[in-house]
């Protein structure tokens, strides 16, 4: 009977796989972004499945147990849908489109593997030589890559739309940076490049051996390893969520002639100050519209047309002016005044203050002729 060999190639892939599964277990325990983290965990599990045929192949599993052939460890047609579902779920509360159909290709691949796995050895050998390797293997590889490319394009466009939504609809845009999602998508782009190089080599030179494809698997393992660490270390708070209606890009309605948008924006500003709503660091346009008993479209027009600003800058301008009043009134601690006026951190306050006033808080205090005991 063939002996198993745990060489360095197997051990390296095993080490990566174990770490990915440990990271997945920690992600499942997180209380925030549970739905998105579930998709990320599944993505890491599918990645481990992708490495498994190589990992056990180098160890001699297929030589010792030929019946393992066609076992559906690698389910690459799930990769693209999981990337899209993760990006969507970080930024939205509803299910990623197109619903259950999103998972159909992956389950087709799984079903095919399960059916072939239980066939006898002679049937497997004939099918592999005449059908699977000439046709289906190429379809699986190219289909998985195409699905991943489509998912990345859709996710990147959605990411850009989300960044624009943050600026227009959330006062937390200055302190909340969705860079983790951007980094995740860039990593997926690098993964696509690695897989694409492998597929191009197969087209140019014919089928590649386990040894020839091993560097691509190591590159993929490194990418997923970095992603797992990034998810554990960087993604520490929930993303502000886009409401369902914001995905539609319908044409705006015509504006009523003669409406005093500037006056309405001024009234809105006074109402926000009177209610102290600007003191809430995570105030959003949908929440403010609800409190005003109006709709978000009308509120956005009031801010955009009346104040000439997006929602984020409109609220932060009110906060900066509140800090300036605190300092003019004798407040000595700049940071304490900033936190009392709706800012969540010193870094965010310094950045927003400089952006709106054109100077740092320290320079502003100096212009007022007062020493700055605390600030930037």
Describe each PLM feature range.
Residues 1-19, 142-145:
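Hydrophobic transmembrane alpha-helical segments in integral membrane proteins
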Residues 13-23, 39-58, 79, 112, ...:
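Hydrophobic alpha-helical transmembrane segments of multi-pass membrane proteins
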Residues 27-39, 89-100, 164-177, 209-210:
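Membrane-interface helix-boundary motifs at transmembrane edges
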Residues 49-72, 121-128, 201-207:
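Helix-loop junctions on the outward
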Residues 66-67, 134-151, 218-221:
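Alpha-helical transmembrane segments
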Residues 91-118, 132-144, 171-188:
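The cytoplasmic-loop to transmembrane-helix boundary for the fourth helix
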Residues 189-243:
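Interfacial "cap-and-anchor" motif at the non-cytosolic start of specific transmembrane alpha-helices
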Residues 232-336, 340, 348, 352-355, ...:
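Membrane-proximal linker segments that couple transmembrane helices to downstream signaling/catalytic modules
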